[in-house]
UniProtKB/Swiss-Prot annotation:
Belongs to the RimM family. Residues 103-177 form the PRC barrel domain. It comes from Thermosipho africanus (strain TCF52B). Keywords: Chaperone, Cytoplasm, Ribosome biogenesis, rRNA processing. One of its GO terms (molecular function) is ribosome binding. It holds the Pfam family RimM. The gene is rimM. The lineage of its organism: Bacteria, Thermotogati, Thermotogota, Thermotogae, Thermotogales. This is Ribosome maturation factor RimM.
Length: 178
């Protein structure tokens, strides 16, 4: 028996969120969390969780097509706009083992969130709280304590080592923090 949301989502990763309805035939806008289109374009069976309603369900993708910076998704059995509205705001999860393998210097955000961040001298700076996509490069948000954050660009100038397996990142402290 599943007792907690953590158990329910164990082994799964959020890859998108369902936005507003599209048209009158039960379609929804799908906004990816990933820059790997093959992940989204290969969706078949998905897990949906809506944080507001606390509803979790399994759905089958009937149709998916690319629009302007987002996708239009049609779920099997959702035939009209009224039914589709129930899914707005739901996160789309897949099993982690469905993700494509990455090269050594690539990472999925979930692999580095929670990593300990250490400077060159061995001083612990904090823990990665989130990863922000800026367009030119990713930026890790390092939670120093409950009130202070450090933003570090994920570029070779600042990242010395990024060890996904051991959740440890060694960084060169940015000059603006000295």
């Amino acid at each position: 028996m599943i007792n907690t949301l953590r158990e329910l989502l164990s082994g799964k990763v959020a890859v998108a969120i369902l936005g507003k309805t599209h048209g009158l035939k039960g379609e929804l806008k799908l906004h990816p969390f990933t820059n790997f289109p093959e992940i989204i374009e290969s969706l078949e069976e998905i897990f949906l969780y809506n944080e507001k309603t606390k509803q979790f369900m399994v759905a089958t993708v009937e149709n998916l097509r690319l629009a302007d910076g987002y996708y239009i998704i049609k779920l099997n059995g959702v035939e009209n706009v009224e039914n589709a509205r129930k899914f707005v705001g739901s996160k789309v999860y897949i099993n982690k083992d469905e993700l494509p393998n990455l090269s050594k210097d690539e990472y999925y955000f979930f692999e580095i969130v929670g990593s300990q961040v250490i400077d060159e001298s061995g001083k612990v700076l904090g823990v990665v709280d989130e990863v922000i996509q800026t367009g030119s490069n990713d930026v890790i948000v390092v939670n120093k304590n409950k009130e202070d954050e450090i933003l570090i660009p994920v570029i070779y100038d600042y990242i010395i080592t990024l060890d996904k397996e051991n959740k440890k990142i060694v960084v060169k402290v940015p000059e603006w923090l000295d």
